[in-house]
Amino acid sequence: MAAIRSAVIVCNHLSYLDPLLLIALLERHRTIVKTRFFTMPIFGWVLKKAGYLPASGKGQFAGMMIDQLESMKSFLQRGGNLFIFPEGTRSRDGKIGNLNRGALKIARLCNAPVYVLQLANTDKLFTPGKFLFNTRITNTISLKIIDCIQPTHPDNMPSTAILEQRVLKAYRKQQK
């Protein structure tokens, strides 16, 4: 993971542990965060100062979204990564759900490669709906790269719909 640079990274989302793991593994990163987190005292300020993007660019967050998107291309070119959980929420059954296309649109706009990551078993350690860690079972958390979509030419990046199909295909192949 440490070798990934200048990329948009999409990952399945199973548990509240997932963003913490990716933050720990990725040296220079930004991410798209649920907009409501930006309204929380102190935490919202920290997210804004860290360069994170609100998931919605509506209302009071429009200016922040525009500012962050305008700087994204140079951030990626300097070796930074943008990671996102494109489902926008945790999966309750472990299967990939419908994807929001925001990260894929940013990849096209910035002509950045898209790395598709798959996390496994974080939901067994920190089950959605539970408050405590489940330490009664033996569990191995894994994270692997299951696809990398490289731009072939600045003017020839696949459409957002094609990128979405390829991401979904990579996840569905892993679920078999």
Language-model segments: which ranges?
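Non-catalytic C-terminal accessory region of glycerolipid acyltransferases
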Residues: 66-176
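Catalytic core of membrane glycerolipid acyltransferases/transacylases, capturing the structured
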Residues: 7-61
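A short, conserved beta-strand element in the Rossmann-like catalytic core
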Residues: 2, 15-16, 89-90
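Short, solvent-exposed coil/turn elements at secondary-structure transition points
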Residues: 1, 37, 58, 120, ...
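A short, well-structured juxtamembrane/interface segment
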Residues: 1-7
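Structured helix-beta-strand junction loops
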Residues: 4, 28, 49-50, 78-79, ...
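Structural alpha-helical scaffold elements that stabilize or flank donor/cofactor-binding regions
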Residues: 2, 46-47, 106
